[in-house]
């Protein structure tokens, strides 16, 4: 029985770039279900590739896009921040700072489930990422407190 084929890093990078383009083309207040599903599929596919084993296609471009995503988020342009973070990830698919930025943008867009998934992926890549850990703990505490209030 043959192994199912897994996407290559080049194919994953292409998918991230296409997601960034799709986010730029729409102006809804929330993300399309297709985008959320595709981000989940990309995260799952990336977990079959060991971070650092393959060189990032263009780390300098990724860093520039990270700076652009940070500025967009500071200006309240969450969709732009997410698009830039995903485009940056096309150049550096295992960059924890870009995954963290994508998660932060998702949270600001109200996509809490996506934000949690991306924060967890950030920590999968870099378990010592302090900001991702702090945000994940804060969100977890919030939801645990919310469940406790519902049970009472």
Model-predicted segments: where are they?
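Alpha-helical adaptor scaffolds
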Residues: 54-108, 121
């Amino acid at each position: 029985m043959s192994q199912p084929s897994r996407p290559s890093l080049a194919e994953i990078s292409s998918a991230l770039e296409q997601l960034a383009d799709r986010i730029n083309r729409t102006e809804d207040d929330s993300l399309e279900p297709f985008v959320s599903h595709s981000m989940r599929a990309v995260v799952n596919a990336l977990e079959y590739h060991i971070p650092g084993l393959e060189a990032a296609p263009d780390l300098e471009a990724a860093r520039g896009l990270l700076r652009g995503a940070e500025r967009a988020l500071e200006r309240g342009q969450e969709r732009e921040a997410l698009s830039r973070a995903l485009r940056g990830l096309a150049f550096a698919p295992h960059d924890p700072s870009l995954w963290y930025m994508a998660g932060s943008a998702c949270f600001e867009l109200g996509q809490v489930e996506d934000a949690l998934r991306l924060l967890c992926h950030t920590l999968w890549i870099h378990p010592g990422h302090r900001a991702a850990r702090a945000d994940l703990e804060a969100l977890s505490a919030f939801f645990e407190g919310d469940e406790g209030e519902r049970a009472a």
